[in-house]
């Protein structure tokens, strides 16, 4: 997202916002009877995967995490198993979210440099990008479907992209899809939801992107409330950012948490009736420096439910056939490079920067 931060830190925190790593590694109790043991030839270890007989509705959004943890902090290993890292030329540029065995959502603005599938990879099963585990997978992209109306009718409108993976993933406790909400879904007023990503922890000090996945609890607000932070565009004013029906806003009421550069395309998920739904994809925000003065803005996934279903159906004849890369394969060796190469991570490019009512708005990757 444009970088999840708490106080002076993205989803993480440099002060009281920084907490210890959460939750031990354990398998999904909901489907323990449907797990099978598989030997990973790369490191001769045995892991558990979900049997392929489970339907998407049975497995999506099911994790052991059901409660609340306060503040921005490092995310535990199995908390957000749909979280993905989008890689351009081997480097993290954006977040993404798994929604099916071979389908991933992200933000359209992450694909301004290239829309060639072979330029991208999707990393799943990671919390620390420098530390692959036996669950980690690096997937090739077969198809990039950018919404045809992206940025067409209003700034950052239809900021969504659908990626078809070249091969299907095997579900495990570390790799599971989030549920996609239907168009008519009702989210309770002031619902507490969670954003996650590997974006910058601070905008004012450009330290390297964090390797560890960070998370933050944000409160959904109505679009009418959100519009109060972003005045409507006036001809000649140079203002173009506004809140439309295809967007959803979320904020920490203390204004201490925000998305930041590198988080774009990552998920905003809400727990609804026992399952986690991806209600938003990180899109844009005001600058993530203190003080945080406005909500974070996400692409509203339910608005695009039909578009997602139609494109998945029309692409069903494209059969993925390439095996995923395992951490032990050459492509996965040292996926981020050692610490000496941290500076090689692509720095976010300011795609849009406007002064709006003394708020510097930016959409960053």
UniProtKB/Swiss-Prot annotation:
Hydrolase listed as a keyword: yes
GO molecular function terms listed in the Swiss-Prot or TrEMBL record: serine-type endopeptidase activity
Primary site of residence: cytoplasm
One cellular component (GO) term of this entry: extracellular region
Signal peptide: 1-34
Residue intervals of the Peptidase S1 domain: 69-313
EC number: 3.4.21.-
Keywords on record: Cytoplasmic vesicle, Disulfide bond, Glycoprotein, Hydrolase, Protease, Secreted, Serine protease, Signal
GO biological process: proteolysis
Record: glycosylation sites: 44
UniProt xrefs under InterPro entries: Peptidase_S1_PA, Peptidase_S1_PA_chymotrypsin, Peptidase_S1A, Trypsin_dom, TRYPSIN_HIS, TRYPSIN_SER
Keyword Hydrolase: yes
Catalytic site: 109 (charge relay system), 159 (charge relay system), 264 (charge relay system)
Enzyme superclass (EC): hydrolase
Cellular localization per UniProt: Cytoplasmic vesicle, Secretory vesicle, Acrosome; Secreted
Tissue expression as described in the entry: Expressed in testis. More specifically, abundantly expressed in the haploid round spermatid.
Role according to the record: May play an important role in the sperm/egg interaction; released during the acrosome reaction.
Family: Belongs to the peptidase S1 family.
Protein name in UniProt: Serine protease 40
